[in-house]
Swiss-Prot record:
Binds 1 zinc ion. Its EC number is 3.1.-.-. It comes from Francisella tularensis subsp. tularensis (strain SCHU S4 / Schu 4). The lineage of its organism: Bacteria, Pseudomonadati, Pseudomonadota, Gammaproteobacteria, Thiotrichales. Its cofactor is Zn(2+). One of its GO terms (biological process) is rRNA processing. It comes from the Bacteria. The gene is ybeY. The keyword Signal does not apply. This is Endoribonuclease YbeY.
Amino acid sequence: MKRKLKMDNLNINFINDDEHPIPSQDLLLKCLQLVANKHHISHAEVNLNIVSNDEIQQINKQFRNKDKPTNIISFEFEKPQGLPDDIANDFLGDIVIAPAVLENEAKEQNKELNDHWQHIFIHGLLHLLGYDHQDDQEAEVMENLEIQLLAQLGIANPYIEQENQNGR
């Protein structure tokens, strides 16, 4: 199933061929709106691919050299030479999410599934905007921004339990 969801000049192209269960698409569009507003982006388009654990494991192995399923992988758009700016500037990239991984994580971490979806989608959007967490300083910047954005949605800090477990 392919569906385009649009709010003003913000678009999410949902690609969910196997019709995996996903939360309200309006929730995810609200996440895009928050991230876009925070970064003063007036036009944005994202592809959101919903896949199985097997599919995301293959993608994870191919692009990250990790042979295991993961919750999300983001691919920032790289503008091909010759593509007009007015076409390329709006497209942020592709996000791939495995709903079964999110469901398991939400259960293990005692989180509401919709809250976890919104957190992970925001996390992926931030990757598309160049944020990363390769070192502790980058991780802190990205996590703090996620916490701020999630608070605007009424979602608690998703890192509290992890911080306590990891001693961070």
